[in-house]
């Protein structure tokens, strides 16, 4: 079996896997944390300028860019939403560690 087949098998198995309630709880916390950092960061510089520079009029409308509701390519939306989250994240306020894992992962996952 080649590597891509192994990866595909893993993805199929994960789609039907039942997650523990604690895993779902922590995933929800990561999404909420990401949104809480992304939303205020989206209106702070340099994010309005980044949106103006990266969103093209003819782009395929594949994924949403917050908070404007603009659509862009998947890569551009992930970049812009991730940049917004990183603008206002505070690494020192997460009680269980000095990080915000959602800021680096949720935008790309969506």
Map each language-model feature to its residues.
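N-terminal core-entry segment
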Residues: 1-110
